[in-house]
Amino acid sequence: MLMLLVFGVLLHEVPLSGQDKAHSEADDAPGKALYDYSSLRLPAEHIPFFLHNNRHVASVCREDSHCPYKKHLENLNYCWGYEKSCAPEFRFGSPVCSYVDLGWTDTLESAQDMFWRQADFGYARERLGEIRTICQPERASDSSLVCSRYLQYCRATGLYLDLRNIKRNHDRFKEDFLQGGEIGGYCKLDSHALVSEGQRKSPLQSWFAELQGYTQLNFRPIEDAKCDIVVEKPTYFMKLDAGINMYHHFCDFLNLYLTQHVNNSFSTDVYIVMWDTSTYGYGDLFSDTWKAFTDYDVIHLKTYDSKKVCFKEAVFSLLPRMRYGLFYNTPLISGCQNTGLFRAFSQHVLHRLNITQEGPKDGKVRVTILARSTEYRKILNQDELVNALKTVSTFEVRVVDYKYRELGFLDQLRITHNTDIFIGMHGAGLTHLLFLPDWAAVFELYNCEDERCYLDLARLRGIHYITWRKPSKVFPQDKGHHPTLGEHPKFTNYSFDVEEFMYLVLQAAEHVLQHPQWPFKKKHDEL
């Protein structure tokens, strides 16, 4: 029984508390549901997958006349893909490969499997398979620490954190922030196992710097009343990338979502603590997104300064810039696209932020052009391109500038999610493609010689991607003026040939109208 407790994460049977609370006999009263089903807050498509991994909830639902999910009980074979018992045909989608990248493998089947392991729920399966015990409890109430390889993900119980003597400076991820005895638990520490995981020690790639001083304590932190503060709620520790850049910040959110899968818990009754060793605050232009993951404000670590803090349950989340991680440092096999993970992430965030689809519209294709008010990568003949689009009666054209002071992030998401063709210059704003509808296309008007960034992100999300194809028909204002590197294509502005632009947009429209999820199956000769 004790071993089952220790390896609960690995066996995928012990979720974080807060989501799945057993009902009492008093709850069995007639007219009252046996479970708080509204607390799940999951898209309808995700419910059978949740029930597959939470059979106790499925059992309650089967006996409960108030359960709204009875129709999903017939689909309990459905699984995300990382579960040991998951048959491939029941996975939450599978990648599609159009050709074999011989630099990686030699068959379509192996290419599909490789892509699934690189960037889909197969990535979660590999992390789950790596988890081992670093600090072993002697009894169920003792502390514990289990981690994946390189300490990219860890889960602790009875965690002791002593912040009475720490020293802060300008460094957000100070590696010697904690000393021996200032972090630990009452459990049997395998110090060799801990030290052996330091090969990828780096601020946004590993938790090794924070946990290398984990100490086997000679007292039980909570039972022996050694804590100034006891945090009862499950707590996620996160080291965050740049909060002012959507591409980088959504690496944080995607990895938090993946961590929830590893924990088999999607509860929002949790705390999120930003691990930051500096005295600074954190500028966050996308803070509304946290509402998809927690009911509370994000807590800065310095909130606990000068205190001994104990956490009953703590998770050290997967990180945004892990080597071979998701999605900043992801090496991807070519020729494959469409991960269930990124589609599920998109659905999850949109559902919890209450962003709804108001279309598509019969006889219309909704085209959104993302303008830039920054100094570089402006579309110099934007008005000319917009006027050309408006000559096509099928197109419903909108020009937006996603400036956070003028348009809140939730309003930005509503526009993006209700777009069929999304057009923009190379830049972090194209990360919005994550929240386009499945049938949509994204047109990176010019990639500024950074060919893979948004092409790969579109492949991960499963969104059709096009970009400018004829160098002779794009006209830079000059050769670019990088502040230190000199000439650089990202540091200038561009004009575009109107005829070539329209040709590419019409190609994108044809994809939208022919997509299997486009509901209006008519001829579109007007294009």
UniProtKB/Swiss-Prot annotation:
Signal peptide start-end: 1-19
GO cellular component assignments:
endoplasmic reticulum lumen
Instruction: Quote the InterPro entries the UniProt record gives.
Output: Glyco_transf_61_cat, Glycosyltransferase_61
- What's its EC? 2.4.1.255
Glycosylation sites per record: N354
So which tissues is this one expressed in? Widely expressed. Expressed in brain, heart, kidney, lung, skeletal muscles and thymus. Highest expression is observed in lung and the lowest in skeletal muscles.
Give the family from UniProt: Belongs to the glycosyltransferase 61 family.
PANTHER family with a match to the protein in the record = EGF DOMAIN-SPECIFIC O-LINKED N-ACETYLGLUCOSAMINE TRANSFERASE (PTHR20961:SF148), GLYCOSYLTRANSFERASE (PTHR20961)
Q: Know the name of this protein?
A: EGF domain-specific O-linked N-acetylglucosamine transferase
Per the UniProt entry, what species is this protein from, by scientific name? Mus musculus
Gene that codes for this? Eogt
